[in-house]
Amino acid sequence: MMGTEGTGRSDNPLVNKLAANEATTCLPIRMSRSIHVLQMAKVAGFDSVYFDMEHGTFSLDDVSALSLAAWNMGLTPLVRVPNHSREHIVRTLDGGAAGIIVPQVSTAIEARAIVEAARFRPRGTRALAGASPPLGYAPISADAGSAILEARTLVIVMAETVEAIANADAICAVDGIDMILVGAGDLSDELGIHGQSGDPRIRAAFEAVAAACRRHGRWLGVAGVKQQPDVIRDLRSIGASFISASTDESLLLKAIITEAQNLAATFTGRAS
């Protein structure tokens, strides 16, 4: 698999679990800037977290500090960058993220540009930023630093459109891509079946991407199906090894609403 080629075992625990074909979980963080939510994710058993710069309001300073904190807790820190910008990809990784999730990738041309930004030579043109946060400011050679970061870094692209599903094989064929993360939410929106992850058309899309991942040695990720256990089990059976959970804000909101409803029923007598 990508991320370990030519450099031995990665120091990224998520990479090593994926390479062992273990099922892995990720908590998306969109709201919290506190390291305490990272401690909660760790004690809950999540393998990784991702900080959402596409739909959240994180700054680069935010995701850098949180990425380093997550790393020190044994969680793999990923960042969903806001777009395909090379600047966001490079600065996010230089700030300490162990991988990027790039939204709305629909063609092999887009995937190649992402690899160009995220990978070191010969697969990309990322430059080593010298003594830097992801290396703990260790005084090591450029060759050694590049090898460590190349083995650590996960390059994940999201397939969220009908075009992306049609191009899954070509996207998977791009050297340097590690994972295709199928976004069932946006895909179901485009198909006019919002949220219906069990629809045969969504299942066919996952199967098409799964087959492409098998052919090219990529990992298959799942997003947008967390409330549907039967669908999740089915996707695991066809090769999915990474799943994105509900966001921190949605989990908190759900808990707050449930608590308010319980108190309304047992104490205040007011319907909420």
Describe the predicted segments one by one.
Residues T4, S85, R126-A138, A159-A166, ...:
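C-terminal alpha-helical cap/extension of soluble enzyme domains
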Residues M2-P77, V81-H84, E116, V155, ...:
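Conserved N-terminal beta1-alpha1 strand-loop-helix module at the mouth
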Residues E87, G99-D175, D186-D189:
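Conserved anion-binding
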Residues I29-V43, N83-R91, V162-V174, K226-D234:
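Short, acidic/polar
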Residues L27, D52, T92, I100, ...:
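Conserved, mostly hydrophobic/aromatic
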Residues L60-D94, E116-G124, A147-E150, G198-L220, ...:
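Alpha-helix-loop-beta-strand connector modules within alpha/beta enzyme cores
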Residues M1-P28, A138-A151, E207-R215, A271-S272:
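N-terminal amphipathic alpha-helix/helix-capping segment at the start of soluble metabolic enzymes
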Residues G99-E110, I180-D189, A240-T258:
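Glycine-rich phosphate-binding active-site loops on the catalytic face of alpha/beta enzymes
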